[in-house]
């Protein structure tokens, strides 16, 4: 009976862990964002901006919230290593795409990459947050301007694709994409100053709670816990 109660207590008090991937072009401020999150939520501060270099591979960080642990994976955004992103899609619970709202020359490239992320079937039902970073810059586009810029870019792409006889996106795929774009959440942040970072983390906390993905290792743990509890309960009943 002790083991049954102990197992039940551990199950009820354990903190669920969710994986969040941070992606975007190189130079968008992904690592600065992660380090600011670590500084705001952990006892040990993250790296200062002057110590941050280009990410080759990944950086990780973990924060503890009420009943929840968020594990962040900051993935390199250079052209030659973006193909690693898809390897993280199956196991992530949320996606953060960071766009440099101050770099207008690379917005088109950023939207092209973002569009490919939206098309990934593995994360079709995974919460996705678009962050317009570098809001501390006076030349930065606002949240509304970023949203409109992407919508305009996407509309131009659709019109161009319709003129291309090789274009073969099905109605269902197009409808799903249109629905996702319409419901897309865009938030403004300054990873450098920390402005908007806490609201973004709050968004993630709420969304991962409401959109849980059950993975094989989680399922196995639950089955083992249930089986163990059932055996303990059966022993107790037999002795009664």
What are these model-predicted stretches?
Residues 216-240:
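Extreme C-terminal disordered tails of eukaryotic proteins encode short linear targeting/docking signals used
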């Amino acid at each position: 009976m002790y083991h049954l109660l102990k197992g039940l207590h551990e199950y009820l008090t354990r903190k669920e862990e969710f994986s969040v991937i941070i992606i975007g072009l190189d130079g968008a401020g992904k690592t600065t964002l992660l380090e600011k999150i670590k500084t705001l939520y952990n006892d040990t501060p993250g790296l200062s901006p002057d110590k941050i270099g280009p990410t080759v591979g990944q950086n990780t960080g973990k924060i503890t919230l009420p009943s929840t642990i968020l594990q962040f994976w900051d993935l390199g955004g250079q052209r030659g290593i973006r193909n690693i992103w898809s390897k993280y899609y199956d196991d992530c619970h949320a996606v953060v795409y960071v766009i440099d709202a101050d770099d207008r020359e690379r917005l088109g490239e950023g939207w092209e990459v973002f569009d490919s992320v939206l098309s990934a079937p593995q994360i079709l039902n995974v919460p996705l947050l678009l962050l317009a970073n570098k809001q501390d810059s006076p030349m930065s586009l606002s949240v509304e301007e970023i949203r409109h810029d992407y919508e305009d870019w996407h509309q131009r792409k659709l019109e161009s694709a319709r003129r291309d006889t090789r274009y073969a996106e099905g109605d269902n795929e197009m409808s799903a994409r249109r629905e996702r774009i319409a419901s897309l959440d865009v938030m403004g942040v300054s990873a450098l100053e920390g402005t908007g970072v806490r609201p973004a983390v709050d968004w993630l906390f709420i969304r991962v709670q409401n959109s849980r993905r059950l993975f094989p290792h989680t399922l196995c743990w639950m089955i083992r816990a249930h089986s163990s509890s059932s055996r303990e309960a059966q022993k107790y009943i037999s002795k009664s």
